[in-house]
Regions:
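Nucleotide/phosphate-binding sheet-loop regions of phosphoryl- and nucleotidyl-transfer enzymes
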Residues: 2-392, 419, 425-428, 435-440, ...
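Structured functional modules or segments
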Residues: 450-453, 457-497, 501-503
Length: 883
């Protein structure tokens, strides 16, 4: 509870730019511009603490805060010499929201507050402009009804259209004062019909309604969605800015506009913006009339233009960043309504940062710190040009699981992908959900669309690793796999029809959109070189193929933190050997099948060592449950039985015996190696032989295999598997007469392993946190099923973000921190890494830096994001251990 003496309200002249937390971004910047002596209409800010109190008081404004608002209205009346509700000199205000972080379009604005039936008459006389007065009044009624009382805009738009039709005109500006006065009456009647009460005539009642509406809009669905996407906590709340109105719609010597100090699309150092004469601010943004470019203001009002250019230079120099400004001209007098760091494309962000360094305005560290790591995603993948997106209409939306843009013909199976691609077609693979068997099809598809699965489903994880566009979890699709068609947005799409996916927004289009290839600029290289200079964390990649490994190295990866061996087994040439191994009854049969696989695995590992050129490579032993590899299709079962010379019935029984109720917690990971040590022997042999072979060809490379045992929960389990690995590896190294070293470590992905990490570190030379499984087991929900209920958890503010995309620092993070401390106690030089999907999430990277991890590992296309995030973490909090 706040005490009675809390100050909830600040005049613009009482605040400054450093008070963002209290005054919000807009309020702090208005205060800062006021203190810089800029022409800012006077006003005050109701703090974010008042918003928090509003929610604490069950969505009501308590008497203490209301009293302070009234006190400050009186102060504003004294400063301006105008009065609320006065017939001779009325005070009109705008009410706008402004959170700490800029949230464009999320919160609502009300202009011309203070007008009523009497004041509008006085206003018309005072300004000698009745048309302007009634235009302002009808706008106010419309905005107040929409924003405060939640009566949709469309009803009022309809009345305007009817009026224009009746008068035989096409533009709003062609309506006369008499028409607008009549419209205001019609609007009030509409208000009465919809709400069963009169439109409020008391300006103070209007003001309290508007302030409540801004507080309430902090929790509208748009705002909640934007906050989740941008990691903005709901506890921040929004401030409210109450500001004396200035009018851009007073006639031909008035106007309003928006401008950027540099081009937000390209970063070019040139004023960019537009303005409208005789208009109010909302008109520019709403796109009702076509505005003029900012340079044309030079011809219309040269003095105002010069003053504006001067202010732009001052603001950019003061904030040391590109500014986005709103301004109004009232009877040839310029007023600044807002400035903030402008939103920009990723390419523009890099150019602006480099230019500001070259201009001596910021340091290299500041340049690295000012770029949003997530925005780099857009630079590395194809995109749809803006004009394509403006033209096309989405037919549905799923989750934006892997960025990029793709257009192709619909196919429904992985095999069909290959068939169509062989004919030279571009395809999109549409599945209920993908499985490891679809890997080849996923590899050749331009994009992947799934009905089920979240941001960390199989499809999403694999697609991000390959840099393939993916939209997952589009539950609105009615799938008919048998007949190779689906229904979405009321239309049926068949195999071979064109669709397009936008992996950055999750939008699905029922047509072919053209894509633009990603272009990496020289500025990208400069920023990345600076980032590498400042970061302490190493950045590795999760890669299972030489192609992925090379791609990651191009993006700056310093090694492989996770090479999964199972993906290599789904190749059509190998699947039968692995199936023979799984359904064998005896060790001899198993070893015979494994001996076929060993040279294949060795060749794979050699190719990966070659691609990594001596950088560290961590290879994980077989992890998935065996049932994932066995055939389910009757024809495949028959073929395998024939090949193994056993009956179909016997084989079917073996396959059924592999069925588990909860395979994710079943016979998988190191449990396979304890039951079948010959699997660990074969894989170790392939890893060591591959390393020895590449070392003999490339003596200059430092190759030191890192063998990782998955799903360990008990130190003795690891000791058992490590003995098998050591016996095999040492024998091979000795036979080769080599002095090669290797390391054995484990994945920490079971909570018990985290709690007993001191014991496990006696055996493990490194830990890699498998945060996908660690998150599942700590929360107790499966990532493949969580999508069904997580939405309700977000809506009810139980969770604010997906724990599979962004590490849960309070729970899972605590386990990670504990394991690091326990592991170091036993083995001070233990290497610590993370290889879950969260490894490419900036907030997770910062956490990993702070708890002292050695490296993070993420999919190839996220490597630049992790490099930048690691540098930002080091700039924010340098680590003592790295000095």
């Amino acid at each position: 509870m706040k005490t009675m003496s809390t100050k909830y309200i600040y005049l613009f002249s009482e605040g400054n730019g450093s008070m963002r937390e209290l005054l919000g971004g807009k309020g702090a910047n208005l205060a800062e511009m006021t203190s810089m002596g800029m022409p800012v209409p006077r006003g005050f800010t109701i703090s974010t603490e008042a918003c928090t109190q509003y929610y604490a008081d069950d969505r009501t404004i308590n008497p203490e805060i209301e009293g302070q608002i009234m006190e400050y209205i009186t102060k504003l009346e004294e400063i301006t010499g105008k009065q609320f509700g006065s017939m001779s000199n009325p005070l009109l205000v705008s009410v706008r929201s402004g959170a700490r972080a800029s949230m464009p379009g999320m919160m609502d604005t009300i202009l011309n507050l203070g007008l009523n039936d009497e004041v509008v008459e006085a206003f018309a006389k005072k300004t000698k402009n009745p048309r302007f007065a009634y235009d302002s009044y009808r706008r106010f009624i419309q905005m107040y009804s929409d924003v405060v009382m939640e009566v949709g805009k469309k009803y009022f738009e309809q009345l305007i259209d009817e009026m224009k039709e009746k008068r035989g005109v096409t533009q709003d500006t062609e309506l006369t004062a008499k028409d607008l006065k009549e419209l205001a009456e019609m609007f009030k009647a509409e208000y009465r019909t919809k709400l069963g009460e009169e439109f409020p005539q008391d300006p103070k009642e209007q003001l309290m309604g508007a302030v409540k509406a801004v507080f309430r809009s902090w929790d509208n669905p748009r705002a909640i969605y934007y906050r989740r996407m941008n990691d903005i906590p709901s506890s921040w709340g929004t401030a409210v800015n109450v500001q004396e109105m200035v009018f851009g719609n007073m006639g031909d010597t008035s106007g309003t506009g928006v401008a950027f100090t540099r081009n937000p699309a390209t970063g070019e150092k040139k004023l960019f913006g537009e303005f409208l004469m005789n208009a109010q601010g909302e008109d520019v943004v709403a796109g009702v009339r076509t505005p003029q470019t900012i340079d044309q203001l030079k011809d219309v009002m040269p003095e105002v233009y010069d003053q504006f250019v001067d202010i732009c230079h001052k603001l950019e120099y003061h904030y040391r960043d590109m500014q986005d400004m709103e301004f109004t001209i009232e009877n040839k007098k310029l007023f600044m309504l807002q400035t903030r760091n402008g939103k920009r494309t990723a390419a523009a962000a890099l150019k602006i940062a480099c230019d500001l360094v070259d201009e001596g305005m910021i340091t290299e560290q500041e340049a690295v710190a000012m770029i949003d790591p997530k925005s780099l995603d857009a630079l590395l993948h194809p995109t749809f040009p803006k004009e394509e997106l403006e033209r096309a209409k989405p037919i549905g939306q799923g989750l934006a699981a892997s960025p990029g843009a793709a257009a192709g013909r619909i196919v429904f199976t992985a095999d069909d992908v290959v068939t169509w691609v062989d004919k030279g077609e571009k395809v999109i693979l549409v599945r209920l959900e993908t499985s490891p068997e679809d890997i080849e099809g996923m590899h050749f598809a331009r994009g992947i669309l799934t009905v089920r699965g979240g941001m960390t489903s199989h499809a999403a994880v694999v697609a991000r690793g390959m840099g393939t566009c993916c939209v997952s979890g589009c539950g609105a699709i009615k799938m008919d796999e048998a007949n190779k068609k689906f229904e979405l947005g009321g239309k049926v799409y068949k195999e071979g029809d064109w669709i397009s996916l936008d992996g950055s927004t999750g939008n699905i289009y029922g047509e072919r959109l053209h894509t633009a290839e990603a272009e990496i600029s020289g500025e990208f290289g400069r920023i990345m070189a600076w980032a590498d200079k400042f970061r302490a964390l190493q950045v590795r990649t999760n890669a299972d193929t030489p192609k992925d490994a090379r791609q990651a190295v191009n993006f700056g990866a310093e090694g492989i933190g996770l090479c999964r061996t199972e993906h290599m087994f789904f190749d059509p040439d190998r699947i039968s050997a692995i199936r023979q191994m799984i359904v064998s009854d005896t060790v001899e049969q198993r070893e015979k099948a494994l001996s076929k696989l060993e040279p294949m695995q060795q060749a794979d590992f050699e190719a990966i060592y070659e691609a990594m050129k001596g950088r560290p490579v961590t290879i994980r032993l077989l992890d998935p449950p065996l049932h994932e590899f066995v055939p389910t299709d009757p024809a495949d079962i028959e073929a395998l039985a024939k090949e193994m010379k056993i009956s179909v019935e016997h084989l079917t029984n073996v396959i059924h015996s592999l069925h588990e109720f909860n395979p994710m917690m079943g016979h998988r990971g190191c449990r396979l190696d304890v039951t079948f040590p010959e699997i660990a022997r074969m894989q170790t042999s392939a890893i060591i032989k591959a390393a020895l072979a590449v070392r003999s060809r490339r003596p200059a490379w430092q190759i030191e295999p890192e063998i990782m045992v998955p799903l360990v929960g008990e130190a003795r389990e690891l000791a058992y598997v490590k003995n098998v690995i050591d016996a095999t590896a040492q024998k091979l190294i000795k036979e080769a007469g080599s002095d090669m070293h290797y390391k054995v470590g484990t994945m920490i992905e079971i909570p018990r392993a985290a709690l007993t990490a001191d014991d496990i570190a006696k055996e493990a030379e490194f830990f890699s946190f498998g945060t996908n499984d660690l998150t599942q087991m700590t929360f107790g929900f499966s990532r493949d099923d969580a999508g069904k209920f997580l939405a309700s958890y977000y809506d009810n503010k139980i969770y604010e973000s997906d724990p599979f995309s962004k590490l849960d620092q309070a729970g899972v993070g605590r386990l990670v921190q504990m394991s690091c401390e326990l592991g170091r106690k036993t083995r001070p030089d233990i290497k610590l890494g993370i290889c879950g999907e969260q490894g490419g999430d900036p907030s997770t990277v910062e956490f990993c830096h702070n708890v002292g991890l050695t490296y993070v590992s993420c999919s190839p296309f996220r490597v630049p994001i992790a490099r930048l995030a690691a540098a930002q973490a080091a700039i924010k909090a340098p680590r003592a251990m790295d000095k």
